[in-house]
């Protein structure tokens, strides 16, 4: 050991009985209460419904889910992790580790769907497409650029836009199928993911606003300009990505409205004014209905389960019950 080496003389354990920010405990409890795993959703019940889709509709669905997998991979392995060094409290660090883990659960969820409904060749083709699609790769490049930078508040902006905006061009399609009574178990799983992402976007946006209160007015103005510039850049790319995916099935304009609707929600999470007027965000009511907790699948956004979510029940037994 060299003479210049310095040992850490004290390490503090996280104490949940001493909170600097009550929001950390509130969000932790919400996230852990919402915990779920994809293996508990019986996607196999959607096999007959999958068979009613055309070859083009199947390809579209797989490409949409592959794009979502890429975003979850980025958020789970880079995005949420990159926010940890800038956490203001140890409890915030804990929440961010939970977020990172659940993003990896989300990424695995799509593989669960693929392995149930698709052939290996189809899966490989979809992942190959994700690596070759210019707009999908550009989306990842833009976000990663800020995750790997050295400006904590800009990282939070990029993360909030990913959580609250970028996912939604993909989330549209399973809600569309669900509104037509197709792939309803898959839609139930996507609702579980959407519920998580809503909490993630809210929390990271909240932490951005807390950090914003600590900087001067000039920096605040610069960050606001940056946020809208980044949103415009991401939105323009997302429109091209949406056209590439949805033009053939005639859904592009509806998806764009859904994008603008969620872009406004992302800005609100960051404490900023909505960008798009109401007449440009009038989402198809069937999609909003499919998103709601009272959708046909009776998904409960707050209990951690939907009608498709299966959990074993404990039954009291006696020794004689095990004599076969």
From Swiss-Prot:
Gene disruption: observed consequences: Lethality.
Cofactor binding comment, as recorded: Binds 2 iron ions per subunit.
Entry cofactors: Fe cation
Record keywords: Deoxyribonucleotide synthesis, Iron, Metal-binding, Oxidoreductase
TM region(s), chain numbering: none
Induction: Initially decreases as oxygen levels drop, then rises again.
Activity regulation, short description: CDP reduction is stimulated by dATP.
Catalysed reaction equations from the record: a 2'-deoxyribonucleoside 5'-diphosphate + [thioredoxin]-disulfide + H2O = a ribonucleoside 5'-diphosphate + [thioredoxin]-dithiol
GO biological process: deoxyribonucleotide biosynthetic process; DNA replication
Subunit structure: Tetramer of two alpha and two beta subunits.
Protein name listed in UniProt: Ribonucleoside-diphosphate reductase subunit beta nrdF2
Species per Swiss-Prot/TrEMBL record: Mycobacterium tuberculosis (strain ATCC 25618 / H37Rv)
Gene from which this protein is expressed: nrdF2
């Amino acid at each position: 050991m060299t003479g210049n080496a310095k040992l850490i003389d004290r390490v503090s354990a996280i104490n949940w009985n001493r909170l600097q920010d009550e929001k950390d405990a509130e969000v932790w409890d919400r996230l852990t209460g919402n915990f779920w795993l994809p293996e508990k959703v019986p996607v196999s019940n959607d096999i007959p419904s999958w068979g009613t889709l055309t070859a083009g509709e199947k390809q579209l669905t797989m490409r949409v889910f592959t794009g979502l997998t890429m975003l979850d991979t980025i958020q789970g392995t880079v995005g949420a992790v990159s926010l940890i060094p800038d956490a203001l409290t140890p409890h915030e660090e804990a929440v961010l580790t939970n977020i990172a883990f659940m993003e990896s659960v989300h990424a695995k969820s799509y593989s669960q769907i693929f392995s149930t409904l698709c052939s290996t060749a189809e899966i490989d083709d979809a992942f190959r497409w994700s690596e070759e699609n210019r707009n999908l790769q550009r989306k990842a490049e833009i976000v990663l650029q800020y995750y790997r930078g050295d400006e904590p508040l800009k990282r939070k902006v990029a993360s909030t836009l990913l959580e609250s905006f970028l996912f939604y061009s993909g989330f549209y399609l399973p809600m569309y199928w669900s509104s037509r009574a197709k792939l309803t178990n898959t839609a139930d799983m996507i609702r579980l993911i959407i519920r998580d992402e809503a909490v993630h976007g809210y929390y990271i946006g909240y932490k951005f606003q807390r950090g914003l209160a600590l900087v001067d007015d000039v920096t605040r103005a610069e960050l606001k300009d940056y946020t809208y510039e980044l949103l415009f850049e991401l939105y323009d790319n997302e429109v091209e990505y949406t056209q590439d995916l949805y033009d053939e099935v005639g859904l592009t304009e509806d998806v764009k409205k859904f994008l603008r609707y969620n872009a406004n929600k992302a800005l609100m999470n960051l404490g900023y004014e909505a960008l798009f007027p109401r007449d440009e965000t009038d989402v198809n009511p069937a999609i909003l209905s499919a998103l709601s907790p009272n959708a046909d699948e009776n998904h409960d956004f707050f209990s951690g389960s939907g009608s498709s979510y299966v959990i074993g029940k404990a039954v009291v037994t006696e020794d004689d019950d095990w004599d076969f």
